[in-house]
């Protein structure tokens, strides 16, 4: 037996509360930020998180397409970055402990809780990839100005565009901070050694914690660039203000001399 797991970043966020109220299936587990369904009649599984990721278990292409169209009704802003990850759960009753590999995990038995843990880790991986893309774009967009500063000793960016850039950086950072819980271990692993072991090994396999640390480091680089750009812009604005004051003083002197 094999379960194919597919995770897709569909939107920046979902309205989970509204979705749960209107989706005609009973949840296996969930909270205000996530919901997991074990659809036993069709041997399918579904996991939806409020930060825009959906994970399918044993869904064919038609069923996936229909659900994606449906879930978009609960999305704030859709994402078109082709962020997708596939993983497999294989059953082998002859083993006693889970065996985690790069693209599949082998388990001694299959139950909804095990599938949920696998789905959760894939969700975390895709969500991290989304934020990696966003921070990569921020670093790339700031690189142009850093090169310009190195070669010309000045920045051509306007105050308005800098403020837009600052807003974009803060928006990404706030989104990451709001969704820090994606790294939290689910409650059901606390009292279940088998699930805890599976969760820990999957986190290692997907490099969840190292990737988050790298993400935090890259955000720090962006923030340092912001500080530099702001300082340069403040100096430029200060110099411009000084020239305005000097010109006004000169005009005042000329007018005074003319009147006398």
Task: Label every PLM stretch briefly.
Residues 1-111, 117:
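Short Lys/Arg-enriched alpha/beta "domain-start" segment
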Residues 19, 66-67, 127, 131-134, ...:
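Hydrophobic side chains in well-ordered alpha-helices
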Residues 22, 70, 134, 141, ...:
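Residues that form generic nucleotide/phosphate-binding pockets
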Residues 27-34, 89-101, 125-141, 163, ...:
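Phosphate-binding glycine-rich loops and adjacent basic patches that engage nucleotide phosphates
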Residues 102-103, 147-148, 193-194:
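Short, flexible segments with low predicted structural confidence
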Residues 113-178:
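Membrane-proximal low-complexity regions enriched in glycine and acidic/polar residues
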Residues 152-254, 259:
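Membrane-associated alpha-helical segments
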